[in-house]
Amino acid sequence: MNDSEFHRLADALWLTIEERLDSWDGDSDIDCEINGGVLTLSFENGSKIIINRQEPLHQVWLATKQGGYHFDLKGDEWICDRSGETFWDLLGQAATQQAGEKVSFR
């Protein structure tokens, strides 16, 4: 994958997150902000989830209260380079914990 393809795929990931949060009807307020290629989810309790792109590595990084994760694109899924879990599963788990209610991005 070249840099422009990586950015196109990362942009699509950011857009999907925004769209899913816009259509989410949970009780918790989750704000989504994109600034300089960094996507920040802010929760009512003051906690945050930070998602950013690491262009030199062609990775997406996820920072949560539970820890940090690095994802490589394998096929059409972003996969954690340590656990093998998908980006969507880990993001959903972290958002659920930080929102205090079930949040799904699938």
UniProtKB/Swiss-Prot annotation:
SUPFAM superfamilies in the record: Frataxin/Nqo15-like (SSF55387)
Biological process (GO), any one: iron-sulfur cluster assembly
GO cellular component, one term: cytosol
Keywords annotated in UniProt: Iron, Metal-binding
GO MF: ferric iron binding; ferrous iron binding
InterPro entries per record: CyaY, Frataxin/CyaY, Frataxin/CyaY_sf, Frataxin_CS
Record family assignment: Belongs to the frataxin family.
Protein role: Involved in iron-sulfur (Fe-S) cluster assembly. May act as a regulator of Fe-S biogenesis.
Name of the protein described by the UniProt record: Iron-sulfur cluster assembly protein CyaY
Organism: Salmonella schwarzengrund (strain CVM19633)
